[in-house]
Amino acid sequence: MLSRISTCLGALILFIAIALAAPIHLAAQAHYGVVELGELGGTAGSANGINDRGWITGTDNLTGDLTTTATLWLNGSAIPLGTLENGPNSAVAWPVKNNNGVIVGISELPDLDPLGENFSCWPFVGTGDPTGRICKGFRWQNGQMTELPPFPGGYSSYATGVNNRGQVVGWAENGVHDSTCDPTFQILRFRAAIWQPDGTMQELPPLPGDSTSAATAINDLGQVVGISGDCGIAVGGVSAKHAVLWENGVATDLGNIGGDAWNTPTAINNHGTIVGFANTAPGTARVYEAFIWTKAGGMKSLGKIPGDLRSTANGINEKGDKIVGLSRGGPHLFRAILWQDTKLTDMNSLTVPGSPFLLLAGDIDQQGHIVGEALDLDTGEGPGFIATPVPPGTIVSSAVHATPQGTLSENVRRQIDRRMGFASELIP
């Protein structure tokens, strides 16, 4: 691992020297030098967000790969953010864009849920199996992790995003026993939530006729995106019957691309452009593709790599011309992908020689840096990565790297599935 990091860092220093020696002209398609991020003792990690200060956030496995911790990477080094009340697992599972030092995510508590629930957090942490523990959203700043409470009567909450105004979004249980829940997993109703900087909490209602809602991202204008549907098992599926946009607390249906489940926005920029993934046919089977939504054009599929099964869009830049995500072809076939002006490219065709194989792209910042999860072909480990645009003329891959299908360890595969909340086969 250290030798590969040294090689990649050396390559980046060379890129900088080239950049200083000659003026840079923007190319139609960027190419990338890749650096693996530090690990915390385990064999897999995922960089899920990057802000405009270069703070990278995500999740990393601890020694033994049985527990995960919310992680901040600064200058490539991993900093564990800890857990609430010394609970076993935590994660930053969604892109966090705040530039003022605020990070949000989820943490399991040591306590078991009094109702025997398995709330929404479990697929994103640990081994991706039900734990029966209470889970709370958290707000982290200046080394301090603070709990984000549920609505009255509830036990658990989940935080996904925070804007530069300090508004945190996610979802939280209330005290209502919901008949649309699958009681083997979830009993209490949950609703989309905004936790304001002053500590107050606001509910964002579902669409008329739906039971539950959840918020997944917020921009600096206070526009919130998320899902509306039935309770189910409180993870995707029927809880995402509709992709929604809340403006001033009012929900608008964003439409669909043929499906009535898994309609999930993942990010919204300050121009109101939304990306995510959505089913292409009725039913809860995972037949989703990445989508882009604009006010002028509505929801449109971004497609997937030909022959693959599904795709997701995970992050978008402010200009809206670059989107990053994942194309998946099977249990061991994952590829980080980039859409530039909606044209899809396997990122492994854009990297310098000696780069690791890029499995998943989680987010992109305004300078074009992309973060995600890679496969180190020497060690078999799956560290987080940052990909940095390189000057034109730098030697890059002439073709897509040979796809390392069948070589992914179970820990690496599960870490990628944890990024999307699919680490367990119990998710329908």
What are these regions (language model features)?
Residues 2-428:
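Residue-level hotspots at or immediately adjacent to binding/recognition sites across diverse folds
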